[in-house]
From Swiss-Prot:
It is an enzyme of class 2 (transferase). This is Beta-ketoacyl-[acyl-carrier-protein] synthase III. It comes from Sinorhizobium medicae (strain WSM419) (Ensifer medicae). The last Arg residue of the ACP-binding site is essential for the weak association between ACP/AcpP and FabH. Residues 251-255 are annotated as: ACP-binding. The lineage of its organism: Bacteria, Pseudomonadati, Pseudomonadota, Alphaproteobacteria, Hyphomicrobiales.
Amino acid sequence: MIRSVVRGFGAALPKRVMTNKEMESKVDTSDEWIVQRTGIRQRYIAGDGETTASLGEAAARAALERAGLTPDDIDLIIVATSTPDNTFPATAVNIQNRLGMRHGAAFDMQAVCSGFVYAVTTGDAYIRGGLATRVLVIGAETFSRILDWTDRTTCVLFGDGAGAIVLEAQEGAGTKADRGVLTAQLRSDGAHGDKLYVDGGPSTTGTVGHLRMEGREVFKHAVGMITDVIEAAFEATGTTADDIDWLVPHQANRRIIEGSAKKLGIPLEKVVVTVDLHGNTSAASIPLALDAAATDGRIKRGDLVMLEAMGGGFTWGSVLLRW
């Protein structure tokens, strides 16, 4: 049985760090208020010359280097982003060009904060279907450029960055002991589209628009949706929360992260948390967290890792993989 195994990983962050203290000078807020409600202490903000594509390229190159591969070895690039450099062409095609690739395919996926989970699921499907041997999956965002910097309820939450993994086809035994993606569960419900959205677009306002969010409504749904889709992954693979070595959640808010882990019975010692350093980087948050935990040695070969995310739409999903 063919499995999609993580062969390499990488990350990239903008040069500029914006602390909560600096945020105090922009809007009516405080470090104490932000930390207490979100767990965020700082975030990275893209500067001149730093774009979604440039950050994505840097993360991709880091992942390729760690995998011992070159762009020539990649068959497909999937970029999860809600903040593309252009309406078209796709950011993935831009990154393909930056990497010097003249073969294969490249496209973007947009599922907001769930984007990386959706992209990994799609890359896994290409590999299992025999359409690709190696897939470069990137989550890259510059959310700072769609924020309303006068809205203290949203501008304090988000940051910029990119992360990437290389998925490679490897033969497995077809058991839960295999390395690679074991199952993926995706969900969406468009009835909640007005809870987290951008108030602009090419066919409506002709503007980029700004992010708008009903935070309490998002929080109200988040824990239940996340735990349901993780439990679906357990059922599909015959695993339980006790089998999980690491939960790598979308880094939206520490309260959501802790609430989901508690409901699932996963101790916080097994949860990778980077929201304090990065803020909410949407589709980039999971690969950034993976990179941090794999680089410092927490996530090791053979570990059972659960990825989960929820984003605007609503969209949500989980991927269970063995590292």
